[in-house]
Structure formats: C-alpha cells, structure tokens
A protein has these predicted regions:
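Positively charged n-region of N-terminal signal peptides that target proteins for export
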Residues: 1-4, 167
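Hydrophobic h-region of N-terminal signal peptides that target proteins for export
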Residues: 7-17
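Surface-exposed acidic/polar loop and edge beta-strand patches at domain peripheries
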Residues: 18-183, 189-348
Length: 348
C-alpha cells in the first residue's frame, strides 16, 4: 500500500480532474484476449482486471512504481492457447485438489475424479468446475470509496451432471485504498433437498521476481501456519502432520514447493506474504464467515524460483474433501456463506 499525507492527497486531487477510482470495460480483441473489467485506483497507482468469461478470475493485479508498472500475476491477461500452467487467479470451487474414493490412489495428481452423493457417483474435475465456466457480470460501479465489479456463477445444465445442487456463487472484486478485496458469497438453492457441501480456494499465482533484475531466490515468504499435512509415498494425504511454520521469513531458495505443501493450524486471519528485496511486498489475507474442524488447509504452497511463480493457494478446505468429509462447508437450502481475500501491496 502507498502511504500519503493528508496534504499530499489533497494536492494530488486538486491537480487532477479525474476521480480517484474508476471501473472500465475493455472488450475482447480476438483469440487469447477476452473482455476484462479493469478497476483503477489512480492515487495508489494500483489496477486489477477481472475476466468474467474466463471463470470470473482475477486476470491482472499491478502497481505503478517509479513510473513503471509492476505486474504481480503470472501470465497476467495471457489467454493464448498452449500447454502448461496458466497462472493468474482462478477460483477453485466446489472442490480443491483431486477427488477420489478413500483408500484409492488418483490416476494423476490433479486429474478428474469422482465422489458420492446419496448413493450416486458424480464426476468432479480437479479443483472443481467453477474456473472452467463463464461467469456473468452482474454490476460494476465506482465512487469516492472505491471501484468494484460483481460476477456470478449459477447452477445450470452444465453443472448438474457433476454437482446435483442448486447454487449461486457471487464474487465481488473491490479496489479501495490501494487494497484489492475479493468477497465470495456462496448460496445454497432453496430447492435443494439436502445439505450442499463444498470446499473453496483460489489458485492465485504470483510471478517471480516482482522487480526485474531481482534474484527470485532472494525473495522471502512468510505465513502464519503451525503445521503441514503430510503425503504418503503415493502422493496422497496420509492423515498425519508435522510442525511447519514460516512465521520467520524464509528465502525462496531455501525450499522447493513443486510438490505442494498443504499448510494448516492457522488463527482467525491467516496470511501469506512475499517480499522482493528491491522494496516491494505483497500480503494476502483470508477470512471466512464461519469455520469447520481440522484438518483444514488455509494455504497450499506451490511453486518456487525455478518455476518462475509461487502460488500461496489460499484454501478453505482440504484435498479430496468431497470423499473424506474433512474440510467441508455444509449449507442448508437457502443459506449463504462468505469468504474474503485481501491483497495489499507496499512499495518504497
């Protein structure tokens, strides 16, 4: 976040005829460049772009520093076809990770799977289906308090074969005071005949380094975890855990998370922070409207300097939750549940 004095803010306002906050739509410009909604904070020099047609995801998050833009997301606004990790900030819902019958081994670490509901087996893509479907833009606005856009996903003929529930998921992106807040509201349909169950996450990917010329291995990471959930020799969660904390910042060169580290044991406001030694830091905080019992992964750390990205992967759930029953939010019909992410940058 940029910090300005009151007099400085007044002076900057007086020099500019433009309002501090704005929201603009940029139309699609052909294959690989979908339409996006851009939120702008002109005083803080921060912008965020949302792509409704691409899973309603965060497509870009950037800050102007010393006259140049610093983009924080890996493959920001890049939708060109091709293999490999796509980056950006896709929402993971109604599952995080692969889903497979308890006691079996998934065919791939993040491949398609299955889970049961009322005696019937349903398919479920890895990390759920929300990121693979177009979302509808509901509204956008800007005023003296900030700029915001709300996108929505509802049950449809495309979702019912893999998720037999009526639902509504709203994601409101709001830029205010240099901070981006993403509010997710999940609502169970009034026609459901049983509790709706889900986990949620975001596979947000930050590019390494933030500042051109930095050795990414010298960047540091910290988070308020106390434990790590362990995997067995077949790569699935074993049910065991060990103490693991990043409360003291660690250099990225000192660990490799190409095999994801499921981190748990957090307090009420879990956070993760990345710091570029050239004076740029980013802090990601999450907060849920209500909690569930442990085990509960809050950050699923993935990537590193060799990969060129780091994904803190904020979760509210656990891998294979739809089969194990752990880390599940359960909603009665007509009820709603909220989850919030906050992204704040600081530069000097």
């Amino acid at each position: 976040m940029r910090i300005f004095s009151a007099l400085g803010l007044v002076a900057m306002y007086s020099m500019s005829a433009q309002p501090r906050y704005a929201v603009d739509g940029e139309p699609a410009a052909g294959p690989g460049t979908p339409a996006v909604v851009v939120l702008r904070d002109r005083i803080a020099g921060v912008e965020a772009a949302v792509a409704p047609s691409e899973g309603g995801e965060l497509s870009s998050f950037r800050m102007k520093r010393k006259g140049e833009w610093i983009e924080f997301l890996y493959h920001a606004r890049d939708y060109s076809p091709g293999p490999g990790f796509k980056g950006k900030g896709p929402v993971l819902w109604p599952a995080v990770g692969a889903q497979y019958p308890v006691g079996t081994v998934p065919a791939a670490s993040c491949g398609p799977g299955t889970y049961p509901v009322a005696g019937k087996t349903y398919p479920m893509p890895c990390h759920g289906f929300a990121r693979n479907l177009p979302w509808k833009e509901l509204r956008r606005s800007a005023d003296a308090k900030g700029a915001r856009v709300t996108v929505q996903l509802r049950d449809s003929s495309e979702t019912l074969p893999s998720y037999p529930f009526a639902f509504q998921v709203d994601a409101t992106y709001e830029l205010s005071g240099g901070q981006l807040t993403i509010n997710y509201t999940v609502t169970a349909g009034a026609t459901n005949t049983s509790e709706m169950m889900f986990s949620i996450g975001n596979h947000i990917a930050f590019k390494l380094p933030f500042v051109t010329g930095t050795d990414p291995g010298k960047m540091t990471f910290e988070t308020s975890s106390t434990t790590q959930l362990l995997r067995n020799s077949q790569g699935v969660l074993s049910g065991e855990e060990k103490p693991r904390t990043f409360k003291t910042p660690e250099r990225l060169e000192d660990f490799d998370a190409r095999v994801a580290l499921p981190l748990a044991g957090y307090g009420s406001r879990p956070y993760a922070q990345l710091v570029d030694p050239q004076g740029v830091s980013l802090r990601l905080t999450q907060q849920a409207g209500s909690t569930v019992g442990e085990p509960l992964v809050r950050f699923n750390l993935y990537g590193g300097p060799k990969a060129g990205f780091l994904c803190p992967e904020p979760f509210f759930g656990v891998q294979n939750s739809l089969n194990s029953g752990h880390g599940l939010v359960r909603l009665a019909r007509g009820k709603e549940w909220n989850w919030r992410l906050e992204l704040r940058v600081d530069a000097h």
